[in-house]
Amino acid sequence: MPQQLSPINIETKKAISDTRLKTLDIHYNESKPTTIQNTGKLVRINFKGGYISGGFLPNEYVLSTIHIYWGKEDDYGSNHLIDVYKYSGEINLVHWNKKKYSSYEEAKKHDDGIIIIAIFLQVSDHKNVYFQKIVNQLDSIRSANMSAPFDSVFYLDNLLPSTLDYFTYLGTTINHSADAAWIIFPTPINIHSDQLSKFRTLLSSSNHEGKPHYITENYRNPYKLNDDTQVYYSGEIIRAATTSPVRENYFMKWLSDLREACFSYYQKYIEGNKTFAIIAIVFVFILTAILFLMSQRYSREKQN
C-alpha cells in the first residue's frame, strides 16, 4: 500500500483509543530559537536544543524547526482537521531521531527518523503574549527568503496547549519529502486575530504581473485516508463520544454566546418592547437547559 500522505482529516469516531499511549515527555526548557525565516511559502524558526521522549517514542527526538501555517480568513488555516473542523492556523514542530541518525537529512530517509507535533491556533478575543514574541519578529523577514536572528527570549513550552492528549498516525511531511509520524494535540492555543493577520503581510517568493504577492494563505488540504491507515488517540473519551469532543466544545461555546446575546437583548428591551424581551428570556432558559444537558452527557462520557 502507498504511504499515507499528510495532512488528513481525523474522524474521532474512527480513531482507536489506546490508553497505552503514555503522556509525552517534552523537554523544551533548554530549546532556543536561533533564526527566523520567510521561505516565501511559510514562516520557519530554527531551534537549538530541546527534545521529546516517552509516549510511544523509542528514544529521544530532538527539535529542529517549527513551521507556521495560516489561511486568508480566521475561520480556516490549519493543515489537519478534526471532524472536518478547520482551525485558524497550525504550528508544526519538526523533530528527528538523533540517537540513530547523524543529521536531519539522514533521518528523513528512514521511516523512524521524523516526528512532527501539530499545535492548532484558534482566534479568540485575547492576545497571546507568548505567540506575540514570534509576531514581533515578522517585520525583519517581510520579503521572501529573508532570514534574521531571533532576538527575543522565547520559551516554546509556553505555546503548548493546556491538555496534552494526542492523536497519532503515520504519514509524511507536509511537502511529502519524507515519512513522518504525527502527534496532533486537538486542544488549540488561543491567539488574537491581529496576531494572525500579521502573517498575511509577508511577501511570497512569486510575483503577480510584477506586483508584490503576499502569503495570504499557505495551509494544505487534507488527503483521503488509505484503507490501512490507523489513527490512535491517547485518551479514553473517544470510546464513548458520539460527536467530536472538540467540535462539541465549540458548539457549546456558540450556544453560550447566543445565550448571553439573548440575555443582553432581554435587559435592553425589558422596559420598551416587553414582547421581544419575554421571547428573549425564554430563549435564555431553553439554551441554559440545553447547555446543562450537554455538559451532563459530556461528563458521563468522560467517566465511561
Curated annotation (Swiss-Prot):
Localisation per UniProt entry: Virion membrane
Annotated SMART domains: Carb_anhydrase
Task: State which ranges are Intravirion (membrane side).
Answer: 295-304
The segments annotated as topological domain Virion surface are: 1-275
> One Pfam family, short name please?
Carb_anhydrase
- Molecular function in Gene Ontology: carbonate dehydratase activity; zinc ion binding
User: Can you list the GO cellular component terms from the UniProt entry?
Assistant: membrane; viral envelope; virion membrane
Q: Which UniProt keywords apply?
A: Disulfide bond, Host-virus interaction, Membrane, Transmembrane, Transmembrane helix, Viral attachment to host cell, Viral envelope protein, Virion, Virus entry into host cell
Question: Which stretches make up the Alpha-carbonic anhydrase domain?
Answer: 1-235
Question: Among the record's GO biological process terms, what is one?
Answer: symbiont entry into host cell
- Keyword Lipid biosynthesis in the entry? The reply is no
Cross-referenced InterPro entries, in alphabetical order? Answer: CA_dom (IPR001148), CA_dom_sf (IPR036398), Carbonic_anhydrase_a-class (IPR023561)
Q: How is it modified after translation?
A: Apparently non-glycosylated.
Factors inducing expression: Expressed in the late phase of the viral replicative cycle.
Task: Give the transmembrane region(s).
Answer: 276-294
The record's listing under PANTHER family reads: CARBONIC ANHYDRASE, CARBONIC ANHYDRASE 7
Family, according to the entry, reads as follows: Belongs to the alpha-carbonic anhydrase family.
Function in brief: Binds to chondroitin sulfate on the cell surface to provide virion attachment to target cell.
Under the subunit heading, UniProt states: Homodimer; disulfide-linked.
What protein name applies here? Cell surface-binding protein OPG105
Q: Which organism is it from?
A: Monkeypox virus (strain Zaire-96-I-16)
What gene is this protein a product of? OPG105
